[in-house]
Amino acid sequence: GLGDVYKRQIKSELTNPKLAWMFENCFPNTLDTTVRYRKTDGKDDTVVYTGDIHAMWLRDSGAQVWPYVQLANQDPELKAMLAGVIRRQFKCINIDPYANAFLDPYDPNPDHQWMRDMTDMKEGLHERKWEIDSLCYPLRLAYHYWKTTGDISIFDEEWLCLLYTSPSPRD
């Protein structure tokens, strides 16, 4: 599976058996429980749920996959999943740069509990509670993914659109 070589390496370096067991079970947890990878229009597209809530927070999804960036060049599936997270984050920001959480567009039963919020809720949003880290985490992930892999394919039309839709000091 994803990151198996890395897991074995780290586990072999840990002398405490409980800590080794915890790492082996915790490290792949995001991949096993919250990642929803697919191809959309021939491009990698990954939604990362935040725990038990079937929605994707920009900050949390970036933090959840962050430990895997260092392994992207060792595993093509992991690299594709990460590229998909970045593309999905860019798409989300383009839906609404002031939102912080988004619904999975392929979820047949999305959770619309916040649609009555007194904000400009749009289709595809889970929550519209803007925080600056909602924009910082996707940029951090994209930058470090690019620096690690050299892959510029993530900087496509969604990226260009994001540059023009993101909040500016004039807003």
Stretches found by the model and what they are:
Residues 4-59, 84:
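Low-complexity, Ser/Thr/Pro/Gly-enriched N-terminal "stalk/linker" regions
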Residues 54-82, 86-166, 170:
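Aromatic-rich carbohydrate-recognition surfaces in CAZymes
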Residues 1-6, 167-171:
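Short, small-residue-biased leader/transition segments that mark boundaries at the very start
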